[in-house]
Every structure is written in structure tokens, then in C-alpha cells.
Swiss-Prot record:
Keyword Protein biosynthesis: yes
Subcellular localization: Cytoplasm
Family, per entry: Belongs to the elongation factor P family.
InterPro entries on file: Elong-fact-P_C, NA-bd_OB-fold, Rib_uL2_dom2, Transl_elong_fac_P/YeiP, Transl_elong_KOW-like, Transl_elong_P/YeiP_cen, Transl_elong_P/YeiP_CS, Transl_elongation_fac_P
SMART domains according to UniProt: EFP, Elong-fact-P_C
GO biological process: peptide biosynthetic process
One Pfam match: Elong-fact-P_C
PANTHER family: ELONGATION FACTOR P, ELONGATION FACTOR P (EF-P) FAMILY PROTEIN
PROSITE patterns per UniProt: EFP
Keyword presence, Cytoplasm: yes
Protein name: Elongation factor P
Amino acid sequence: MISAGDLRKGTTFEQDGQVYTVVDFLHVKPGKGAAFVRTKLRNVITGSVTDTTFNPSAKLQEAVIERKEMQYLYSDGELYYFMDQETFEQIPLEYAKVQEAIKFLKENMFAIIKFYKGEAFSVEAPNFVELQVTHTEPGVKGNTATNVLKPATLETGAVVSVPIFVNQGETIRVDTRSGEYMERV
């Protein structure tokens, strides 16, 4: 059992026969009245998102989630295929289950697939990935008085903000949890 006050992004729990993962949370302590936890939850099976409020002392049943490292193979336009490195079994996943991670995954990269009762429900990209910048505007000399950022499109199609000294064709390291530029490689 976990208390609602301990909910964090990514926590998975069971409630009313359904399994939810926390997409976003906010601990609220109003000046008057009792504290509460406002959450945005995603049903791991249906993919639907709901807003729910909990009392911080409420107890929730923690869900048993299996995490397995698998290799991203390819996409056929509708489904994304991942392969288990031990059994070489391939599993197809629809976009709704990979949308958070796919913008940072190239073919043959490894990712963590989360399973609940044998059914895959989420993909987690590695914390840091190295990707090539395919398009960005050139930096202008003299724009260095402050920390100036510009948008850059990566080889996977993701758009991140990078410093003005990063040029097209360079490889950069990106934190996939926040989508932020870390450094040039």
C-alpha cells in the first residue's frame, strides 16, 4: 500500500479494479482547510486520462509492474515494433503507448517496456540519448549577452531548445525526461 501523499510522476497503482499511472501531480496545502493531492491519471489499459483529487492519507494498492529492456526495431506507420533480447519475440505497440518515448528513439536503440499482467502499456526511453541535429537556424554573432536558445529539429523529429552555438549536423545529448539539451557530443 502507498499513501496518496507519496504519489509521484510515473507511480502506478490499482483503484476500483483499474490500473493507473500518475502523469502529473500537485500537492496543495490551502490556507484554510485540509491538504489534498491533485493528480492527472492515465488508465494503463484504455489510455484514458482523468483528473482525480486524493486526501494525502488515502491508501492505494501499488500495482505490480514488470519492466523489460527491449530493442526498438522499426515502425510501419501505424505500429511500433520492439524485440525482446532474450526470446527474440517481437511485440507491436500502437502510438498511444509509445508517444512519450518515440520522439527520442532511433531504430535499434534500447528502451524499457512496462507490462501489467503480461500486457505492454508504456515505453520509457533511456534517460539520455545522443541525436543529430537535422535542422536549426544559424547562430548570429553578438547574440551572446544572455543565454539565448533556438529551436532545433533532431533526426527523430523531436524539437528541442539548444544554445545558439549548436549547428546543423552536430550530435547533442538530450535528457529524455525533460526534453532538454544537455551538451554537444
